[in-house]
Structure formats: C-alpha cells, structure tokens
C-alpha cells in the first residue's frame, strides 16, 4: 500500500480515537454535575486534547454537544431494545410496566445524568436554544420524536388510540425523573408501590381506548 494511503489511514484512526476520548470525557464530566462541568474546553483538557481538536472534530461547541447527545442516544436505543423485544402477545399492562421499569433504572445511569446536567445548562426557551445551538436543538428534538415512535410501535398491534399513546409517552419520562429524584434524595415513600400505581393507571387509560 502506498505510504500516503498508510499515513491517511493512521491519521484517520488517530482522529477517531481522539473523538471517542473526548465524547467519553464529556459524558463523565457532565455526569459529575461539578461546577463548570458543562465546558467543552475543560472536557477537551481532561481528555488530553485541545480546544482546537474540539473545533476540528466537531466544528464548535454546538456540534460537540450534539455529538454527545447522539452518542448517548445510540446507547439509549440499545437499552430500549430490551423492552421493545417483549413478545408480541404480551398483555398491555406488561408492556407499560416494561417501559416504566426500563426508564426508572435507566435514568440513574451515567449517560442520563450527563444529559440532565447538559440540558440544565442550555437555554430553556426553544427559540433561544435553536438560535444559539441549532445542532444540539435538532438532536434533542430527534430524541423526543424517536421516543414517541418507539412507544407507538410498542402498542401498535393492540388497537390503542395513538393519541392516548402519545399522551402517555409524553408523561412517562417526567414522571420517572420525579421518582428517580425521590430515590436519590431518600424517601419514606414506597417507590415500588408508586411505580405499580402509575403502571396500573396508565394501563387502564390505554385499555379504555381499545375496541370492545
């Protein structure tokens, strides 16, 4: 193989390794919740790179945060496949329970903590977010769209009203964040009981929309 091609392959391999190291460092830093953790230059330093390397790999800080979100989305999709593979003849309540349990445990993961801390540092107003961080905003929008599609697919064969599925899919992430927060803070409440109650309520709501 010509030396120029060998050099090109080596350079590409080093670039990919640098990119992976920066994304891993970003998740670790963001998940820590430390003051100043939402800093691309600090993350670059922790990964042994420079701000110039961030710009080369991702363009700017917007591209960097978008890449972090995309990276965690890939791992999230792999996790969600655990419950989307529920047998097609599984009853409705079992499917709701699988979704709730998966999120309840998954929201305590390093990836989830990283995303929560990143979102907390971004503009709350969608117009500001889209103006200042257009690629990050697009990735966040993609998350929501993918989640809705996943939930619709989970109940598609049961004849459930799609609008009710949409409402339930919109509710569940926020509800699970609340329960996870209670668990992290320490609570006298029985959180297993809370999950069962939520599961029963949502399953009943969806069941009522099925053809009789």
Regions found by a protein language model. Give the residues of each.
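Short, basic, alpha-helical segments at the C-terminal edge of helix-turn-helix-like DNA-binding modules
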Residues: 70-76
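Solvent-exposed, amphipathic alpha-helical segments
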Residues: 21, 25-33, 78-86, 118-122, ...
């Amino acid at each position: 193989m010509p030396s120029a091609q060998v050099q090109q392959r080596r350079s590409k391999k080093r670039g990919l390794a640098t990119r992976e190291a920066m994304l891993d460092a970003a998740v670790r830093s963001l998940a820590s919740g430390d003051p100043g953790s939402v800093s691309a230059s600090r993350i670059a330093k922790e990964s042994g790179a420079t701000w110039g390397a961030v710009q080369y790999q991702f363009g700017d800080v917007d591209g960097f945060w978008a890449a972090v979100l995309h990276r965690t989305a890939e791992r999230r999709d792999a996790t969600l496949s655990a419950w989307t593979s529920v047998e097609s003849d599984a009853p409705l309540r079992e499917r709701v329970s699988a979704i709730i349990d998966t999120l309840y445990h998954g929201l305590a993961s390093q990836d989830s903590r990283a995303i929560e801390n990143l979102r907390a540092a971004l503009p709350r107003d969608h117009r500001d977010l889209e103006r200042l961080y257009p690629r990050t905003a697009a990735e966040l929008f993609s998350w929501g769209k993918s989640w809705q599609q996943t939930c619709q697919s989970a109940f598609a064969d049961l004849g459930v009203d799609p609008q009710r599925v949409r409402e339930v899919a919109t509710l569940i992430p926020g509800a699970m964040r609340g329960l996870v927060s209670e668990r992290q803070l320490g609570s006298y409440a029985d959180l297993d009981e809370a999950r069962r109650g939520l599961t029963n309520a949502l399953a009943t709501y969806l069941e009522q929309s099925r053809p009789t």
